[in-house]
Amino acid sequence: MSYTFSRRAFLKYSAATAVAVAGASLLGGCEYQDPNNPVSKKVNSYLDSALQLRAGLRDMKIENGTCTLTVDIRSVRENPFKLYPSCFSVSVIGVDEDAEGKTKTVQRYFSMNEGGVKFLNATSVLVGKKNPKVEGLQMVATNFPDLQDGDTVLFQYIPESTMSDFSLNWEITKEVYDEFIAKQSTSGN
């Protein structure tokens, strides 16, 4: 019995391993998550940033052409940073059919084109060692469209405008939003 591993056997087992790994990722729904730009697909969820902070989209309501968002932010940073409305943006991405019947992705709304996001209960907030958390920061985006089937609301928070390659993102589909609102109405909130 020989304990040598031939080139042919190596290639055979390498190919089998590659197929197994590829198959496992397809079956397991493997999805890459950029650590600098984490994404949540739920309302009332929190994300951690490499910039030593945690932010959460606590609540979201769309009614009468206004999208109202409630956010919580916690920091463990030594140096303080300011929260401005321009740190946040909201957009709606939908699916549309062209003249040939092919579906394409379209941007139906972008808050920066509508005057940006506005804070309801603050103008700007300093977050740092002396004030490490902001809870219940409310903001609105106006001229907001009613959600249609296939729409996704993209809510983005960029903590430092000079470091726009770091962001926290929420991708809320119409179905997830409708489910969130239904749960709120049944729980009496």
What positions do the PLM features span?
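N-terminal secretory signal peptides and thylakoid transit peptides that target proteins
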Residues: 1-18
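Surface-exposed edge beta-strand/loop patches
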Residues: 38-40, 127-189
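The feature marks short-to-medium sequence segments in extracytoplasmic or secretory-pathway proteins
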Residues: 61-64, 74-135, 167, 180
